[in-house]
Amino acid sequence: MNIKKLFKYEPIPNYEFNIQSTENASVQDLSTEKTDQKVYSSLQKNLEFAQSKYNFLINSDIIIRHFSIICKNKQYKAFLLYIDGMTDSVIVNQFVLHPLMLRNKNNTFDDSTNVQNIQKTQKTETTQNTQNIQKSQYTQNIQKSQNTKKVQNAQNNKNDTQKKYEDLSNYIYERLIPNNNISIQKQFDKIISDINSGNCALFVDTLNVVFDIDAKGFKQRSIDRPQIENVIKGPQEAFLENIRTNTSLLRRLTNNENLVIENVEVGEISKTKCALCYMQNIANGDLIAEAKYRLNNLSIDTLVSSGELEQLIQDGSSFGIPQVLSTERPDKCVKAVMQGRAVILVNGNPYALIIPSVMTDFLASPEDSNLNPLFANFLKFIRLLAFLITLLLPGMYIAVTNFHQELFPTELLFSILVARENVPFPIIFELLLMEISFELIREGGLRTPSAIGSTLGIVGALILGDAAVAANIVSPILIIVVAITGLSSFVIPNFSFGFHLRVFRFAFTILGYIAGFLGIGLGIYVYMVLLCSIKSFGVAYLSPISPNISGFSLKYFVPPFWKQEYRNDFLAPKKQVSQSKFSMVWKKENSNGKNQ
């Protein structure tokens, strides 16, 4: 034993791992390779293609179930391909494998049961003729002719049935698989996409087709209340992550056969299913054609959420001003399609996109149509006031304080000067500090668990504001300005539109600090020019106020429901009239009856 090695220090080698660049590596990606490969008639070739497509040797959730089908004393090998967790095992076992492997004796491929039924029918008719032999000769001749026709029809039906089921694929499709949604595919691209969505595929030897069987059964949450767009008076349903559940909600509320739901796949790798929903007899054809064109011409690998799709289909960035309305409420989407708009649903996302959208849509609440017009218009006025306060109040305050002190009453001006006497920082620093602090409290309240989020926001704002005033960092009047601005931002119904106002507020604050009312006026001019230049799917963003004011247009304030006789003309719908001028017919009938 070497004593030196025993006491010798040997440092532990550092383990290092670096990712090497594979940009120029020539690796075949089967998931994005677009081929028109048709299904082989050889079961072994189909099996090898499916295994290579899904990396079967390393994928643990890909299930391939081998079995045999016996038809007309012949044994046909087959296998079922599906993804574990995406399909319903009850459907696969009882309605796919059970009838195929343990088929009923009545489902014979040579259709011998029909022959037996025909023979029984002939025997019954012969017995009846024997019992009625005492009838007149005329009646017997009629019965004989009828019996002859029945036998001929039965024989013809037998021949048609035998001819029909000479094809094994038709026999399996119509006799062996009791499923309400099954199709026959001849190419791999379609069947692979459906398997990824939860279907199962049946491959049978000697057949160059594959049976696409709907067996979806993945878990999903139940229909719940809206999380963001809550209303006191109105429906309490919200969209889910399953696109078919969402389309069924639209179909149930619309209750009309003119509702068209077209499927579109987006993403070369993810192949995310999207649904374009519109009323065929109302929506403008050019709008629908443009929506299809944009959806079908997206060259991306993956699409996960409706927020990503919103960025891809809107006309331009326009400094963050939202151009597509996002909602989680089915009733809001139904009202949109009834006006002539289109709704886009994305699989895996509980939010729908409404196109086109104008500025007034982002200031509207789902509750407006459910309230009395007087109350609804009062709330809409409050939202309009909150819009102006959120955008301009901090900038107006800093402009008046620095440049236009004469606008303040003398007593109020003295109070502001006394409050700011001990503050060592310029007013722009105070304002930006409190604005950023308020945004931090807001984001912290959103990201923390809901049980303590609201408490954190209230306590944090109180402690921070009181400590800032006590330390002479900010003045009390500034705390009031920031608080009113923050409360006004919460009144905006749409989160995206409210966020854009919060960002633009900083720009108006800086302009007010630099040039006072002149800077704010210049900012308003640029902001209005920007709004006027925006279009959402060919519709002016400031419609119905600009560029054309029409008598048919529904303005910002909501008229009574019985006065909403026309749809928005800026949408150019096929059907302009939405209801009769005398929608309350009962009033007219009662008045006529009284006059008589």
Where do the language-model regions lie?
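Membrane-embedded alpha-helical signal segments
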Residues: 1-392, 410, 530-596
